[in-house]
């Protein structure tokens, strides 16, 4: 899985020398020992938990899960991110030391998913909060897809230059875009009093005369059914 190509050594000579740069050596050490911070909020994180078992064994990639952002260089977000959780996620990312990377796992993390439809509290894409290096679509993604995302991140690390990455980091990021709440016309079915069921928000109690009027309009057979 290591994408860095090493030169072949001459076995005929007793002394062999490998020439490289400090940047390549740093990239090789970082891609071989990624320490992820697991930020799972929904069902996608269960698929990532499968990698810990012996079937996939993600330890062979040098991944060591950490519980502190100050000891992690990779944060893996999985699940829905709400507006109330957004400041906490940004704070965790800011506490991670440089260089740091982000993998967005699942449709809810990348676009908000089905929970972002006419929702005022769901962030439509975690990339509006923190910069994302690898997008992993799926609902939920399979463990094999998670391994492929980690492999792509390792290849990206092997080709990057640290100084260029620092300069390319955005200075400010917004929390989210303005959400559009579309009020659709509801479809009512059945025989019931609309005034009883759909009252104004200021009405906290049902008047007794309205309640008994509705009760008399419904027969006993309908109440049993």
From Swiss-Prot:
PROSITE patterns: COMPLEX1_20K. One of its GO terms (cellular component) is chloroplast thylakoid membrane. It is an enzyme of class 7 (translocase). It is found in: Plastid, Chloroplast thylakoid membrane. The lineage of its organism: Eukaryota, Viridiplantae, Streptophyta, Embryophyta, Tracheophyta. Its EC number is 7.1.1.-. Pfam families: Oxidored_q6. Its cofactor is [4Fe-4S] cluster. The gene is ndhK. This is NAD(P)H-quinone oxidoreductase subunit K, chloroplastic. The keyword Iron applies.
